[in-house]
Amino acid sequence: MFVDLNSDLGESFGSWKMGNDDQILPVVTSANIACGFHAGDPLGILKTVRKAVELGVTIGAHVSYPDLVGFGRRNMDLSRDELIADVLYQISALDGLAKVAGSKVQYVKPHGALYNTIAHDQAQAAAVIDAIKMYNPELVLVALAGSNLVEQARAAGLKVVSEAFADRAYNSDGSLVSRRLEGAVLHDSAFVASRVVSMLKNGGVESIDGVFTPIQADTICLHGDTDGALEMSAAIKAELVKNNIEIRPFVNKA
């Protein structure tokens, strides 16, 4: 059994610091790097890209709605053409920086509100899928495990990797509990680490209302910007190793 570990990185902006990139990067196998639309400035993004390349971490474009003020967590009703252009712009920018650093973008993981919206909104999902195919149809799309997007993207010809979240609570339908609600984000490192292993071995987790919810995950997201993120990431990695679950990237870096 094996699994990929990913994290959202490159999200600092000028003097405003977000996350713990230098500490999280050695733990993960895939880096979802901001592209400037929800967070990240060019210099900070390039530094994160270079560090990822140095450590052999796979680079992914963490594309978002154009929402710096809201950190990409506000829904936007963009036209199809706008959304396609926004996604193309972001992938292109990050891929250019990755090329300078001696690597390339190998997957796309939408961020925040865009991630949640395209999990069920077929029109916006189609725009994101088409943008990825226009840029490079070999790019992998990271999507919420069990969401409609997984099958929609596969039917359109994209490679899709299903994602679960280590520190987020789930509703019984497999969706993430809104961050606005109490209990949406988990903070107990030992509990979260054990939960990740259980999810992988048993194919699901207990939802916030106590129902077993099936989740088949190929990659686990470790958030680097939550309280105790470093301790939690280390605990998860240690628990995976203890249970003989190999940690490796989901894409071929050749």
Curated annotation (Swiss-Prot):
Q: Which Pfam families match?
A: LamB_YcsF (PF03746)
Record field: catalytic activity: 5-oxo-L-proline + ATP + 2 H2O = L-glutamate + ADP + phosphate + H(+)
**Which is a GO BP term held by this UniProt record?**
carbohydrate metabolic process
- InterPro entries of this UniProt entry? Glyco_hydro/deAcase_b/a-brl, LamB/YcsF/PxpA-like
Cite the CDD domains for this sequence. LamB_YcsF_like (cd10787)
What are the alphabetically sorted keywords of the record? ATP-binding, Hydrolase, Nucleotide-binding
Does the entry feature the keyword Cell wall biogenesis/degradation, yes or no? no
Q: How does it assemble?
A: Forms a complex composed of PxpA, PxpB and PxpC.
Which protein is depicted?
Answer: 5-oxoprolinase subunit A
